[in-house]
Amino acid sequence: MLNLYGHKFSSRLMLGTAQYPSPAILRDAIHKSNTEIVTVSLRRETAGGKQGGQFWQFLKELDITVLPNTAGCYTVKEAVTTAKLARDLFKTSWIKLEIIGNPDTLQPNVFSLVEAAKILNSEGFKIFAYTTDDLIVAEKLLDVGCQVIMPWCAPIGSAKGPHNTDGLRSIRAYLPDVTLVIDAGIGRPSHATVAMELGYDAVLLNTAVAKAADPVLMAEAFSKAIQAGRMGYKAGILEARNVAVPSTPIIGKAVFS
């Protein structure tokens, strides 16, 4: 079971709700993915006016856990204000904390992230911190009270998949008891499998499903890929070797003289 701030979930897939062709396709993708948690941008809700309100009502009817985020924020002040508004709107202390440092790469500003996390943790928020694959930053986020760390595997929307598996593996090795969720950069089901094989607790993705030719089928594919990766990790994956090792025993082999 996936444990997030004292709440347990069967699914290890979290799904974003943006960019889908229609609400009906989003609904079907959520069902096929078996996800129990979806992320929502507060800016979509507030900027959308009546349409945003309808979307929130749509999500409530799905009876699913909503994780609001601070997507689009570039400063500590913006992120803290957005988090407080999200708490009022969605009636939850959970927040996926994002503070972007560069508009082109969408790389997290880790310095502002730690500062904002410290403020929000002191005000009772349960933070899901979107960060880079830097171990030291992850440790700093833990120091200020975060319990869920969400390293990227590649830039948002890039679909490149894990490009620094050594860094991700290092975070997992040094933080064995911390809940770690891969967030951003996933492009295909095999990427999600790799993330889970590294020992990560869950995967959050959006574009790879929303922009697929068949989002509903892709959602199901990701669900199964994540299950496979988790099972492989739990089973104990054979480490790669630099030399060949025979798999066929030689006991009983005939000897000719």
Swiss-Prot record:
The keyword Transit peptide does not apply. One of its GO terms (cellular component) is cytoplasm. Keywords: Cytoplasm, Schiff base, Thiamine biosynthesis, Transferase. It is found in: Cytoplasm. Its EC number is 2.8.1.10. GO terms for molecular function: thiazole synthase activity. Its main location: cytoplasm. 1-deoxy-D-xylulose 5-phosphate binds at residues 157, 184-185, 206-207. CDD domains: ThiG (cd04728). Pathway: Cofactor biosynthesis; thiamine diphosphate biosynthesis. InterPro entries: Aldolase_TIM, Thiazole_synthase_ThiG, ThiG. The active site is at residue 96. It catalyses: [ThiS sulfur-carrier protein]-C-terminal-Gly-aminoethanethioate + 2-iminoacetate + 1-deoxy-D-xylulose 5-phosphate = [ThiS sulfur-carrier protein]-C-terminal Gly-Gly + 2-[(2R,5Z)-2-carboxy-4-methylthiazol-5(2H)-ylidene]ethyl phosphate + 2 H2O + H(+). The keyword Lipid metabolism does not apply. It holds the Pfam family ThiG. It is an enzyme of class 2 (transferase). Disulfide bonds: none annotated. GO terms for biological process: thiamine diphosphate biosynthetic process. Homotetramer. Forms heterodimers with either ThiH or ThiS. Belongs to the ThiG family. Catalyzes the rearrangement of 1-deoxy-D-xylulose 5-phosphate (DXP) to produce the thiazole phosphate moiety of thiamine. Sulfur is provided by the thiocarboxylate moiety of the carrier protein ThiS. In vitro, sulfur can be provided by H(2)S. This is Thiazole synthase. It comes from Bartonella henselae (strain ATCC 49882 / DSM 28221 / CCUG 30454 / Houston 1). The gene is thiG.
